[in-house]
């Protein structure tokens, strides 16, 4: 079975470096950001699920248009899609974005667009792919983070990051069995990185030398 790994992070928290570290695993393909596109697919899944189970006459076996009309029911929620088939297509689309070959057996992506409660989309991802493991990465020193790149243009950056870190930590606390919480600062802690590899069940591929090379080579934007 494939191993699916998501890196859910705040901006300027070292998520790209963590992505590079995970990608030392043979046959892995942890992609970069997708501008929250996967969130949109998960929103679609969330909405089609609500439509199916709360509104569509017949739910998983939608009533025909003729049957609805014959019972003098307003067809405002009439639908003809197959829910299970629709879910399968969503899963196939998501997998096709990141599983780039038949031999790829560790795949996923990293994303930073999880503010305003969007971290909760990961629950839908977990429903679709129960084998998913999530690494949540923030930066402990939000003072320095708030002065990095685009954040330094936002006078409310410090408050924003503090709120976001709390949201991420609360999400982790609610889902500890499949989430690992870490920080930018802990990427330089060998024991912590080793635990991450153990968490995603790839401990045999932990390579201290390769990881050091990545940490020593900070690719600039």
What are these regions (language model features)?
Residues 1, 94, 108, 170-173, ...:
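Polar low-complexity intrinsically disordered regions
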Residues 1-89, 206, 210-221:
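PAPS-dependent sulfotransferase catalytic core
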Residues 98-206:
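PAPS-dependent sulfotransferase catalytic domain
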């Amino acid at each position: 079975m494939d191993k699916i790994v998501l890196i859910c992070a705040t901006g300027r928290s070292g998520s790209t470096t963590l992505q590079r570290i995970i990608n030392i695993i043979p046959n892995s393909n942890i992609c970069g950001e997708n501008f929250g596109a996967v969130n949109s697919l998960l929103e679609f899944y969330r909405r089609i699920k609500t439509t199916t189970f709360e509104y569509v006459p017949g739910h998983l076996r939608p009533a025909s248009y003729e049957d609805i009309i014959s019972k003098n029911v307003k067809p405002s929620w009439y639908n003809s899609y197959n829910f299970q088939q629709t879910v399968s297509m969503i899963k196939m689309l998501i997998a096709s974005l990141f599983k780039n070959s038949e031999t790829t057996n560790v795949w996923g992506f990293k994303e930073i667009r999880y503010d305003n409660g969007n971290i909760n989309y990961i629950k839908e991802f977990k429903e679709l792919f129960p084998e998913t493991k999530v690494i949540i990465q923030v930066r402990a020193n939000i003072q320095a983070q708030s002065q990095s790149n685009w954040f330094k243009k936002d006078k409310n950056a410090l408050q924003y990051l503090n709120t976001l870190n709390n949201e991420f930590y609360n999400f982790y606390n609610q889902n500890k069995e499949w989430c690992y919480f870490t920080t930018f600062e802990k990427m330089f802690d060998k024991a912590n990185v080793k635990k991450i590899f153990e968490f995603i069940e790839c401990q045999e591929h932990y390579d201290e030398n390769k990881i050091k090379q990545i940490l020593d080579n900070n690719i600039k934007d």
